[in-house]
Amino acid sequence: EYPGCVAAYGIHPLYVAKAREEDIQVLRETIAREQPVAVGEIGLDRFVAERDDTQQLYYFVEQLKIAQTADLPVLLHVRRAIDQVLQQLRRIGVRGGIAHAFNGSQQQAAEFIKLGFKLGFGGAMTFPRAHRIRKLAATLPLDSIVLETDAPDMPPEWKVGARNTPDQLPRIAQTL
C-alpha cells in the first residue's frame, strides 16, 4: 500500500507491562506470515523508574529467539542497559541489526559492530553537550552508521519542542 515502506514487528520494552504471554506466539505467527524486514523495536530500558526488569528481559530474550529462528535482524532500543543487551546478543546469536539512538562507549560500539550491528545516530547528537557521542561517531567506519530521526520523537537541537520529521536528516548528517 505504501511503496518503499517496510515493516518490523516487536514488543517495545516500554510496553511489555501491557504484553501477555500469548503476544509472543502472535508475534511469531505474524512474522512468519508477513515476512517483515526485522524484529523490533525490542530491547531493555533501565531509564524509566516504573519498570519490571525481569519482565523486560523475558520479552527481549523471547523476541531475540524469534529473530534468530526467522533469520531476521533486530532493531534495538537500549537505555542504561548496553552491557546486558550485548550479553544476550552474544548468547542467542542474531543476524545483526541496528542499535537505535546509540549512546555507548567506544568499546561497546566496537562490540555491536563485531556482532553485525549498525549504530543509529540522530537528533540527540546535535545538542552542544553531546560532544562525546559526536566524537565517537566521527571515529566509526561510515558503513557502521545509520542516520535516524525517531520521528516524531528525539528532535534535533534546532527543533526542540517541535515534532521531529525525516526532512531533518540532511542537517543531522552535517552535524555528524
Language-model features: where?
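Structural detector of well-ordered beta-strand residues that form the stable sheet scaffold
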Residues: 6-8, 39, 75, 98-100, ...
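Mid-to-C-terminal alpha-helical segments outside catalytic/metal-binding sites
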Residues: 66, 169-176
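Active-site phosphate/pyrophosphate- and oxyanion-stabilizing loops and adjacent acidic/basic residues
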Residues: 134-135, 174
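His/Asp/Glu-enriched short active-site or ligand-binding loop at hydrolase and phosphoryl-transfer sites
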Residues: 116-130
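Divalent metal-binding pocket/active-site signature
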Residues: 13-115, 135, 140, 154-167
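Short, acidic/turn-prone active-site loops that include or flank metal/cofactor-
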Residues: 11-13, 103, 123-127, 151-152
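Metal-cofactor-binding active-site regions of metalloenzymes
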Residues: 2-17
